[in-house]
Curated annotation (Swiss-Prot):
Pfam families for the chain: DEK_C (PF08766), SWIB (PF02201)
Record-level GO cellular component terms: cytoplasm; nucleolus; nucleus; RNA polymerase I upstream activating factor complex
Cross-link Glycyl lysine isopeptide (Lys-Gly) (interchain with G-Cter in SUMO): residue positions: K201, K215
Function text: May be involved in transcription regulation.
Misc. comment: Present with 2360 molecules/cell in log phase SD medium.
Organism, as annotated: Saccharomyces cerevisiae (strain ATCC 204508 / S288c)
Region of interest: Disordered: 83-118, 200-226
InterPro entries per UniProt: DEK_C, SWIB_domain, SWIB_MDM2_dom_sf, SWIB_MDM2_domain
Protein name: Protein TRI1
Amino acid sequence: MADINKYIPMVDAILSVSNPDEISPKRVRKALQILYSVNLDSQRKLINELILERFGDIQENPRVLIPKNDLISRDQELSLRLQKEEERPLRSTRKRKGKSESKSKRKKKKNDSPDSNSISVRKVLLSAPLQKFLGSEELPRTQVVKMIWQYIKEHDLQNPKDRREILCDEKMEPIFGKKMTMFSMNKLLTKHLFNPDEIVKHEEEQKQTPEKEIKLENESLPNLSG
C-alpha cells in the first residue's frame, strides 16, 4: 500500500475537480496511468480501494480536499509553478501598479469573508424525508453530504464486498431507496434539495396567475351579453 500512496495527491486533485455523478475508479485509474506513464493493471484492486477511500474522505470533508502535507509532492509543486507563471504578466506591469494593488486588496478583502453565494455556505431547503433524516429544514449542500457520509460510516453501511455500494437502512430508504452507489448519491440528492430563491419565485408566479385568469374572465363577459 505504501507504494501506491504516492498517487494520493493526484487522486485527490482529480476527484476534487470531477463531477461526482460521472467519476469512477476506472476513469481515475486511467488518468493516473496517463499522467505517470505507468501500467497499473497489476495493482488495479489496490488502486481502486485507494480511490474509493479518498472519494469517501473528500465527500465527508468537502472543504479539505487535499491534505496539507501532500502539497510538497511533485505534482502539486508543478501546479503551483504553473499558477505563478500565469500571474507573472500581471505583476510585471509597473505602470498600473496602483490599480493592481487596489484590485489585489479588494480581492483579498473579498476572500477574507465567506461569500454568502458560495456552495459551501449557501443554504438549501431540504425535502420532508431529508429533514426527518438530518433533523434540519435547511443546510449548506456540502454539510448535507458530509452528514450523510458520517452516518454511513458510523453505521457501517458500505457493502464489504463492494465498497462503492451503500446498503441503505430504514432511515435512508425514503431518500435513496434500498441501495445506491457512492457515485450516485449526489444525483439522488438533487431531488431533495431546493434553492429558496427559486421556490419564492415560483410561489410569486402562482399568485399572479389567478389574477390574470380573473381579469381575462371579466373582460370576456361583455362579449357574451352582447
